[in-house]
Amino acid sequence: MESKILRVGMADAKVTKSPGILTTIGLGSCVGIVLYDPIAKVAGLVHIMLPYSNKISDNSNKLKFADTGIEILIEEMLKEGANPKRLISKLAGGAQMFSSKINSDIMNIGERNVIATKEVLKKLGIPIVAEDTGGNYGRTIEFYSEDGRLLVKTIGHGVKYI
């Protein structure tokens, strides 16, 4: 069976079953959050841009935020046969893309996105089994639902599976 590649945009999410592949490009300060049920081989990817929906007045796109995007992704995965007790997660992104002498919350959005993501996953009881976060470089990721591998591609920092 040929693998179908689903592209996930910014503030977007997609779900696939094996042998589907989920990919997102341009993870700078954004975080790509993969959730996976290794028994049902159901995978989901959400590309979040901001940590919390309650801190922004225009929060109509719930997939933009870690706190709401992860929960929506789980709902969609359950419709495809995933079991919430078996979910594991992998993370990539959360970079500090712009250097600044001012250590402000606005400039540390990547770090804040990673922290919020980890808080939400902990609250939901979903373990993080691998991550490639931080740094000052962008990432493109591909998740293979057939075997649970996450390919992380960077410019100048190599390519690796986590």
UniProtKB/Swiss-Prot annotation:
EC number in record: 3.5.1.44
GO molecular function: protein-glutamine glutaminase activity
Catalytic activity: L-glutaminyl-[protein] + H2O = L-glutamyl-[protein] + NH4(+)
A Pfam family assignment: CheD
Top-level taxon: Bacteria
A single BP term in Gene Ontology: chemotaxis
Protein family per UniProt: Belongs to the CheD family.
Functional description taken from the UniProt entry: Probably deamidates glutamine residues to glutamate on methyl-accepting chemotaxis receptors (MCPs), playing an important role in chemotaxis.
Protein name as annotated: Probable chemoreceptor glutamine deamidase CheD
